């Protein structure tokens, strides 16, 4: 698997979702001949220090990230009918500026934006976008949800908005194939 890198990975720190433990994640990347691996736990960065140390100790490039929850309106809006469902977005750090911005976003999500989950909004993403790369995420991302709803143009507009927020070359559409029917449906559209 030379040249392939897992960029959307949930560890044991993604409660009720991730199962891989950090030492095993790093060891598996080595076994597969990968030179880097990311950690992108849901809404939290609890495991990044252990991950960074484990990867560095084994000669693997650690890519620090987080799968954030994006509020449908603003992170301060908390009306059940409109704000109870958030959208996923994967953020990866390109450099130390990105790391500091990701810490800021995740901290704001927990201290200001929490409503069912720690949430950020598009304005915060715009403000703290330097040094970050964004991926469109899983079926719970805004773009896949729009595609599933038959809203191709709205999905396209959201992709263009993310490209504008993060800058040219810093936003990517994510393809996943876990054998899920919905993924097979939207992947050709992505």
Give, region by region, the residue ranges found by the protein language model.
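Phosphodiester-processing cores and adjacent nucleic acid-binding clamps
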Residues: 1-190
């Amino acid at each position: 698997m030379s040249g392939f890198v897992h960029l959307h990975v949930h560890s044991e720190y993604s409660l009720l979702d991730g199962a891989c433990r950090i030492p095993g994640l790093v060891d598996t990347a080595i076994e597969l001949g990968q030179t880097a691996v990311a950690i992108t736990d849901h809404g939290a960065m609890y495991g990044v220090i252990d991950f960074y140390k484990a990867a560095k100790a084994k000669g693997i490039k650690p890519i620090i990230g987080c799968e954030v929850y994006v509020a449908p309106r603003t992170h301060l809006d908390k009306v059940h009918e409109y704000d109870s469902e958030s959208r996923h977005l994967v953020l990866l750090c390109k450099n130390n500026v990105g790391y500091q911005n990701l810490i800021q976003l995740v901290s704001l999500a927990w201290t200001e934006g929490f409503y069912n989950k720690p949430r950020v909004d598009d304005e915060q993403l715009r403000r703290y976008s330097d040094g970050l790369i964004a991926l469109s995420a899983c079926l719970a991302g805004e773009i896949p949800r729009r595609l599933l709803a038959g809203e191709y143009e709205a999905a396209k507009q959201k992709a263009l908005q993310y490209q504008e927020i993060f800058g040219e070359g810093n936003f990517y559409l994510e393809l996943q194939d876990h054998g899920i029917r919905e993924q097979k449906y939207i992947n050709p559209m992505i």
